[in-house]
Amino acid sequence: QFPDFRGEQFALGANIPELLAWIAAHQDKRVVVLASGDPLFYGIGTRMVAHFGVAQVRIIPGISAVQYLCAQSGIDMNDMWLTSSHGRSVCFDTLAQHNKVAMVTDGQCGPRDIAAQLVARGKGDRWMVIGENLAMENERIHWLRVSEVHAEYEMNAVVILDER
């Protein structure tokens, strides 16, 4: 992924314990972890701080997918409940109780799955804002009623609103 980089690399995947051990073995060197997303919102930063301590970790975050989607859509985040379906199960009853929700999603539980669960709970009249391929050339932002979400979407974040 970084063809010009000549140093040692460790590919990050679901192998978090191995990554932490590798970093610990290289503490005498400068180690950089590059990851997409918000590092402290269900991201690698949380695990690194817990493992090494905040004094040993310097986090330089970029803008999160949720922040970007809200900025592009003009949605304020002041009263928003933030969660993620990325790599975890979702409590759809809890999700349905909130008036404004932002989620980072994954291939296991994306907008269509979330919409189906909300419709089953009588929340089909809510709005869903789906940010697809955010900050890329093929970025698309969709405003749909929850009951109208039937397609699959690529690399996305979702905002669910009681009203538009």
Question: Positions of the model-derived regions?
Answer:
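Short, hinge-like loop/turn segments at secondary-structure boundaries
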Residues: 9-10, 74-78, 145-148
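Short, glycine-/small-residue-rich phosphate/pyrophosphate-handling segment
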Residues: 65-97, 106
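Alpha-helical structural signal in soluble globular domains
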Residues: 47, 51-52, 72, 117, ...
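Class I S-adenosyl-L-methionine
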Residues: 1-58, 67, 90, 147
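A short, acidic, amphipathic alpha-helical segment used as a generic capping/interface helix at domain edges
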Residues: 23, 89-92, 110-113
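A contiguous loop/helix-start segment that scaffolds small-molecule binding in enzyme catalytic cores
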Residues: 30-31, 97-164
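General beta-strand structural signal in soluble alpha/beta enzymes
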Residues: 1, 33-35, 57-62, 82-84, ...
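A short alpha->loop->secondary-structure connector
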Residues: 52-56, 75-79, 122-127
